[in-house]
């Protein structure tokens, strides 16, 4: 008999008489493949419709950002003096605030308590040509409408007559063409248009709005140079080095340039360089979007490209044969590829936002730079771990050995021992040597003989920096040598700006590196290789191992295979993912510690502190963590409070959540079952409480679920603790 209980998508679970019904129901709510009566076509349709919901949420969120800044922020005041005014994210209304708290949080020229924005939104909006609260309100309303349209589109595509067919979802060539040309190409072209028609004129003090955008020419010669082939005209007369952003002082006329380096006043990339970059990207991607064969029988078939990829030496077996069908029929494979790409891009965003700041005055807002770097690195870590999780699910659910005989996929499985053992060897080598150097240096400092430290100059990295034009090290080669052909070739184009930027100590482009950087670089390499080892081993052993050849029959996550098969605990692909996330967090901890400490000393003008203290572990613990958390911990104390108090509280709360994680990670199923049964007994024996009964028999979480709960608390607590530390220690010093 069908039951109406949760979960509706699984009658088997809905009829479970224990609390397992709830926990397992939550666990598989998004595992659409496993739901009752799910067909492949319906699966694709459900996921497709959910994408519209996702986009609606994103647009609503961005609309909210615009709305709150327009309503409660100080965008216009900030635009008048971006260096000295602190940008306001939104007002705070908190009935717990006493007078000291009200005063502490009233800043940025506001009349009451506010939060300061550390997202970089003010800098972005200002750079792209927004100047008034009115601009922000209009953008907010527009995005709210877009959000509503996407919600409607999601609903519409669930209606039978508007549900695309399975063949439409599997038409890879059409999808690639549209995504390359439309998503990347045309959107980049549109962005170039916005930069050229709105942002660049605004940066030169000319307002372009809905009232005059059709009459205000972005370039005095209009389209004439385009039609006559005199494209160089668009690069002539760029903004001068004395240009004051947002005014006509020192402004030029060029719209597409290749100046290199930064705008001296805003310390951000030249807007005209960025317009040129987006135009080039647009052309490339629009061309790329015409590569695959669809309607007119011209262009390439993807399956033909892949089938032709067979190494002539024969050493790679069947090469890419069979990959098209495998990838096109596996959502997990596609998701794995997408997550790996997006994760990598997200990490690249973190690196480039500070080294090549694209937004005006972003380089002057240290707290925002620290927040953006940390945010993008953590997000990248989680996303990239997800890539391997779905890769493992692909091996278990979607991989067909017959279809992939002898190709690169089957060869990965065939020599997985070599792959895993090499990763293991690299991790061991990096771990022992790096830790050995750090510990040796610690001991030397403890014994009062710092001169006996082992300090290794990163000569190869310095050589690479010199090749790119950094003169500090005295390597006379390539771009750091004025006589090299590399230097002379681009001297008139982008080099003057680039060389000026790379040799300027006020920015973060190619920071000077030494022995401390060498050590932490290898510590990070250790973390990356160990994380990769655990994830790759989990995926490559997901179908089976010598110990458990039939592992794939047990699915992605299983606790233990019962009595008589000892040693099958902890070896599911999920267990590998679970372990890898700890290593990922560990690694990103080292990455962000390094970035943050290096920059704190750079911004404070005492780089020697990092250089001298980063070569031994006590230096990191004492001069980075301890020294920089003291202000934060004193956000409130017996003598009062200041504006860091919220971060002090979050720092404590983060530690609490993090510590809760260990409770689930260390004590497993039996402990919880006994505890629950004791609580149930107490409940039943207590007057009043015994009037309340529940139908489900309480059953403790399985070890797989307890690990998820533990991991979630560990991760959330870890991120909250460090986020509070980064923002408080940076804003406490620089405001």
From Swiss-Prot:
Its EC number is 1.97.1.12. Keywords: 4Fe-4S, Chlorophyll, Chloroplast, Chromophore, Electron transport, Iron, Iron-sulfur, Magnesium, Membrane, Metal-binding, Oxidoreductase, Photosynthesis, Photosystem I, Plastid, Thylakoid, Transmembrane, Transmembrane helix, Transport. P700 is a chlorophyll a/chlorophyll a' dimer, A0 is one or more chlorophyll a, A1 is one or both phylloquinones and FX is a shared 4Fe-4S iron-sulfur center. InterPro entries: PSI_PsaA/B (IPR001280), PSI_PsaA/B_CS (IPR020586), PSI_PsaA/B_sf (IPR036408), PSI_PsaB (IPR006244). Chlorophyll a B1 binds at residue 655. It comes from the Eukaryota. GO terms for molecular function: 4 iron, 4 sulfur cluster binding; chlorophyll binding; electron transfer activity; magnesium ion binding; oxidoreductase activity. It is an enzyme of class 1 (oxidoreductase). It is a multi-pass membrane protein. It catalyses: reduced [plastocyanin] + hnu + oxidized [2Fe-2S]-[ferredoxin] = oxidized [plastocyanin] + reduced [2Fe-2S]-[ferredoxin]. GO terms for biological process: photosynthesis. [4Fe-4S] cluster binds at residues 560, 569. Its main location: plastid. The chain crosses the membrane at residues 47-70, 136-159, 176-200, 274-292, 331-354, 370-396, 418-440, 518-536, 576-597, 644-666, 708-728. It is found in: Plastid, Chloroplast thylakoid membrane. The PsaA/B heterodimer binds the P700 chlorophyll special pair and subsequent electron acceptors. PSI consists of a core antenna complex that captures photons, and an electron transfer chain that converts photonic excitation into a charge separation. The eukaryotic PSI reaction center is composed of at least 11 subunits. PANTHER family: OUTER MEMBRANE PROTEIN, OMPA-RELATED (PTHR30128), PHOTOSYSTEM I P700 CHLOROPHYLL A APOPROTEIN A1-RELATED (PTHR30128:SF19). Belongs to the PsaA/PsaB family. PsaA and PsaB bind P700, the primary electron donor of photosystem I (PSI), as well as the electron acceptors A0, A1 and FX. PSI is a plastocyanin/cytochrome c6-ferredoxin oxidoreductase, converting photonic excitation into a charge separation, which transfers an electron from the donor P700 chlorophyll pair to the spectroscopically characterized acceptors A0, A1, FX, FA and FB in turn. Oxidized P700 is reduced on the lumenal side of the thylakoid membrane by plastocyanin or cytochrome c6. This is Photosystem I P700 chlorophyll a apoprotein A2. The lineage of its organism: Eukaryota, Viridiplantae, Chlorophyta, core chlorophytes, Chlorophyceae.
